Amino acid sequence: GAVSIENLFTTGVEYDSTVESYTQAFDRQLYTYRDSFRWGYGYKTVKPSYQISPRIGIAYPITDKGVIHVSYGHFFQVPNFSFLYENPEFEITNNNNGGILGNADLKPEKTVMYEIGFKQEIAYRTAIDLTIFYRDTRDWVGISTAIKKYPVGNYRKYENKDYANTRGFTLVLDRQFTGGFGGGVDYTWMIAEGTYSNPQDAYFDAQDNQAPRLNMLPLDWDQTHTLNFRTTFGGKNWIISSIGKLWTGKPYTPEFKTGVVSGSGAFAGFADNSERKPNIFDLDIRASYSLSLLGLKSNLYCNIYNLLDIRNEFSVWNDTGRSTYTLTAKDVSLTDPGRIGHLNEHLLRPDWYGEPRRVNIGINVSL
């Protein structure tokens, strides 16, 4: 719950808990007990997790048109259920790659967030808002070291060991709709870093005999620059609005195509998430006109999504950094008369692109 005093001070405490009706993986050296005793010897019941999450927010007016706002809070996030329950039968092969087991005893991920900002009216119905933020995430889910299994082989499980943080600022300029015009623009600069974006990345590094990562690298969702804007024009019976966005590309890990590098001094590879995908730009337009048809209230509308029909590339080939082509295609035949289908069908990835231009035109009638 939360309480406020004269809309200036807000505080609250949240009590969170997770109670998993499940058991933890068996002991690392599991002997073959009779089925009736196996659960008692080889498994243990998971204990519930509890956390108290304090939060506080303060808004202090410095003029009749300006205010400083500060907030601090703890946030509790239950791990993805696949990390808790993956491989629920605890089936492990007798080799050195027994796979990953879910860990129902994972602790919730804990994020501590700090914000400080300033909001000021700069003109009639127009204001700016600058907010600086920092988010620190502990108990980020990672992968354990290899656990030996009796009599041979090993496996790994998910555990709370990694770390991530996000920091940056957001600047907003907003004008309320008045006099037939309104709009706003917001810009965010952000850095999101951590040891691993996904526990699977740590698992594959371990399979390649790489040491656990200790340095911070850009996370998969690290989007350095984000610019959004909107405008609205309107009259008595009509309105036209636009929504646009310009985002810098998220990171990806580049790689050479197979066979390019060889020899004892071969290049070991690029750092994870060391390059960026192409930037994203999108513009949508919406227009509507109200009228009366046969005594009924009607509204004609036209919505155009991706007005400029830009092919935004959200996923890319790692050897080129583009969705449109890969160097792999240069070394193989793209077609084979003796086969159904060909490589071209694999190289064409429409799911890697954003939606093309789409136009919706219609009418709404109210009785």
Predicted regions mapped to residue ranges:
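Signature of Gram-negative outer-membrane beta-barrel scaffolds
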Residues: 1-63, 83
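Gram-negative outer-membrane beta-barrel transporters
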Residues: 5-6, 133-136, 141, 148, ...
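Outer-membrane beta-barrel translocator domains and adjoining extracellular loop/strand segments
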Residues: 9-16, 52, 81-87, 94, ...
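Residues that define the transmembrane beta-barrel architecture of outer-membrane proteins
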Residues: 48-52, 110-114, 165-167, 223-227, ...
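Residues on the lipid-exposed face of transmembrane beta-strands in outer-membrane beta-barrel proteins
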Residues: 56-60, 116-120, 171-175, 185, ...
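Membrane-embedded beta-barrel scaffold of Gram-negative outer-membrane proteins
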Residues: 61, 67-73, 79, 83, ...
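Repeated loop/turn-to-beta-strand initiation elements of outer-membrane beta-barrel proteins
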Residues: 65-68, 125-128, 180-183, 237-240, ...
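C-terminal beta-signal and adjacent terminal beta-strands/loops
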Residues: 138, 191, 244-264, 278-282, ...
